[in-house]
Swiss-Prot record:
SUPFAM superfamilies in the record: PLP-dependent transferases
Family per similarity comment: Belongs to the class-V pyridoxal-phosphate-dependent aminotransferase family. SerC subfamily.
GO biological process, one term: L-serine biosynthetic process
One GO cellular component term: cytoplasm
CDD domains: PSAT_like
Xref: InterPro entries: Aminotrans_V_dom, Aminotrans_V_PyrdxlP_BS, Pser_aminoTfrase, PyrdxlP-dep_Trfase, PyrdxlP-dep_Trfase_major, PyrdxlP-dep_Trfase_small
Name of protein: Phosphoserine aminotransferase
Gene3D superfamilies reported in the protein's UniProt record: Aspartate Aminotransferase, domain 1, Type I PLP-dependent aspartate aminotransferase-like (Major domain)
Catalytic reaction list: O-phospho-L-serine + 2-oxoglutarate = 3-phosphooxypyruvate + L-glutamate; 4-(phosphooxy)-L-threonine + 2-oxoglutarate = (R)-3-hydroxy-2-oxo-4-phosphooxybutanoate + L-glutamate
Pathway: Amino-acid biosynthesis; L-serine biosynthesis; L-serine from 3-phospho-D-glycerate: step 2/3; Cofactor biosynthesis; pyridoxine 5'-phosphate biosynthesis; pyridoxine 5'-phosphate from D-erythrose 4-phosphate: step 3/5
Amino acid sequence: MVINFAAGPAKLPEEVLKEVQENLVNCNGSGISVMEMSHRSSNYAKIHDATISDLRELLNVPSNYKILLMQGGGTGQFAAVALNLIGKTGTADYVITGSWSAKAAKEAAQYGTVNAVLPKLAKYTTVPRQETWKLDPNASYVYYCDNETVEGVEFDFVPEVPAGVPLVADMSSNFLSRPFDVSKFGVIYAGAQKNIGPAGTTVIIVRDDLIGKHLKITPSILNFEQMDKNNSLLNTPPTFGIYVMGLVFKWIKRNGGVAGMAKLAAAKSKLIYDTINQSNGFYYCPVDVNVRSRMNVPFRIGSASGDDALEKEFLSKAEAEGMIQLKGHRSVGGIRASLYNAVTLAETQQLANLMLAFYKNNKN
C-alpha cells in the first residue's frame, strides 16, 4: 500500500477515486464519460451546479458572494486578483510571509503599486503580529496567503483590515480544512490540487460588490464579471476536474463537514509535531509554534540545518514502507509531510511510528 504525503497534486480520498473509477466510462447513467460530455449539456449542468451548491453549503457562503470555477491555478489568480481589484486606488497591501505571497506580490506589481506591509523577513518562519503591520487605509485590498505550503506557515488569525478595504486570501493549501467566516473576506481563492480535487480548477469566492471593477486590460478568462455572468462557462471549463471536486465536496459532507476536517487536521498534525518536539532536537521544525501549519509539516533531521545522509536514509526507509513524496521543497530542503484532508489518521500514525523508530536507531 502506498501512502501519499505529496504537497500537491495531492492524495484524493480513496472513496472518491473508486467512485470515479466506477463512473469513468458511463457517468451517472449517461452512457458516456464525464470527459466526453458537452459543457453545455443538461447532464454536465447538474454536476456543475451541484458542485457550486455543495460548496456554498459547506462554507455557509452568504448570498451576496459568488462562487466562480476558473482555470490558471493560484498563479492565474495572482494576476486575476490585481486585475479585478487594484483599479480602485491603484495600490494594494501585501502581507508577505512565504514563497507564494511573495510571488503574488511580484505579479500584482505589474498592474499597480504594491505595498509590502511587513519588513522583508530573513526567513519565512513566522507571522509578525498585526500591530507591527503598516497597512494603508487607501489600499484597494489587503492580500495574504493563509497557509504557505513551502515553508509550513499557517495564519492562526484572520487579519483585521481598515474599514472599507477588502481582505483577499489565498487558501489554496488549507481550503475546507477548518471553518471560517466568509463574510470577513472580499475574495477567497483556492487551487483544487491540494485539498479538494485534481489540478486544473481554481475556486474563487468573491463578494458581489467587488465584481465589475476590473482594469480594461483584464483578459476575459481572468475577468470575474465575465465568469460570473456566464456561470463559469465562458469557455470550456475543466469538466472532469469539477466533477471530481464535486465528489470530494460530497465526501467532506459525509465525514463531518469542514468541522470534521478541522478535527482530523488537528489530530494528524499533533502526531507529527509531538514526535518532532519529543526528539531532543533530532527532528527540527524552524517555524514558530503558534503558526505551524496543520497541512504542511517541514522538518530537518539531525540538526537545524539538516544532515544530508540521514535525510536521504529517512526518505529511503519511508519509501520502503510505502510512504512517498516526503522530500521537502527544493528551496528549503529537508522533509515535508503534507497532511491534507484525504490523508488518514492511521496513515499519519505510520509516519509518526517511522519517525520514532528512526530517531531511536540514529540518535547520538
